[in-house]
Amino acid sequence: MSDFKEVSINRAANVYFDGKVTSRTITFADGSFKTLGIMQAGDYNFGTNEAELMEITAGDCEILLAGETEWQTIIGGQSFNVDANSSFDIKAKTIIDYCCTYIS
């Protein structure tokens, strides 16, 4: 889905890693929310509170989920899931455009 209807958008950016990763939170009428963001090339580690679906809409990266030993290559149009109360490492090879869905 490339368009979201009937949402509210928080104008304040979520800023991580000295501005190298930024996102905006969108909230749906049912109270669910997602973040839409941009990640500059680099290596990052993210922790999760809730389970997440990370959709890479553009770009090229490698990810390593907590507890795994094999890096996975993810390109634009692909996605991956992260468990709640977990973490993942990501190596953004190019600028990454992403959509993160929080699963409760």
Q: Where are the predicted features?
A:
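Short, conserved beta-strand element in jelly-roll/cupin
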Residues: 48-63
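Residue-level recognition of conserved beta-strand positions in structured domain cores
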Residues: 38, 48, 65-67, 92, ...
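Ligand-binding loop in jelly-roll beta-barrel domains
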Residues: 83-104
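Short acidic-glycine-tyrosine-enriched beta hairpin
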Residues: 38, 68-88
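Conserved short histidine dyad/triad with adjacent acidic residue
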Residues: 27-49, 81-84
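A short, N-terminal "cap"/entry segment at the start of jelly-roll beta-barrel domains
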Residues: 1-32
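General beta-strand recognition
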Residues: 34-35, 45, 62, 89, ...
